UniProtKB/Swiss-Prot annotation:
An example Gene Ontology CC term for this record: cytoplasm
Gene behind this protein: ureF
Protein name: Urease accessory protein UreF
Job of this protein: Required for maturation of urease via the functional incorporation of the urease nickel metallocenter.
Keyword terms: Chaperone, Cytoplasm, Nickel insertion, Virulence
Domain of life of the source: Bacteria
Keyword Cytoplasm: yes
Amino acid sequence: MNASDLIRIMQFGDSVLPVGAFTFSNGVESAIQTGVVRDVPTLKGFVLTALKQAASCDGMGVVAAHRAVVADDRDGIIRADWAVNNRKLNEESRLMATRMGKKLAEMSIHVVEHPLISWWLEQIKNGNTAGTYPVTQAVVMAAQGIGQREVVVMHQYGVAMTILSAAMRLMRVTHFDTQHILFELNHDIEKFCDIAEIGDIDQMSSYVPIVDVLAAVHVKAHVRLFSN
């Protein structure tokens, strides 16, 4: 990998990329409020569950969309996008995916200036596609020539950091704790990337009941710091 590709991965994989990720907790807010997450070990377990779910659903969508971009199959990109969106059972998850996806597309046309990204944003605005974040990420990175494995790693990192960053504001956990959790999960992320690279949208699965139960709890919560 050359330096140019590496710095693009770092730029677009940055947890402070201006796409609104800081407004979402990926479910950990409800998990902490209900006691499902209460200390470092349970936080690590929650992140691990989220990464596994992401690999078997959004991650496969990333790979399917990336392959469609490489094959210049624009219908395939849209199919992958709807497949990701349709497997998000709760409204807050759909909101997170589509809001961040549109923000990423809007930012990227000013940064990358690639015709495929302009086309993608047009499809989102016209309602021809949902514009989920995982698929938008695949479109933006594939347009820059970044490989599918690298994009899946970016997505997995984003899932983990969204949860860990939110946890810092919601519970007694230190920066050292969250960084140690992330480091320890490296081996698991490698395995989850293998799952995602199946890339078959017919095999995508988002079945993790605890996540949907926590989402339902979050909707009715009286005090909320995050949008999900």
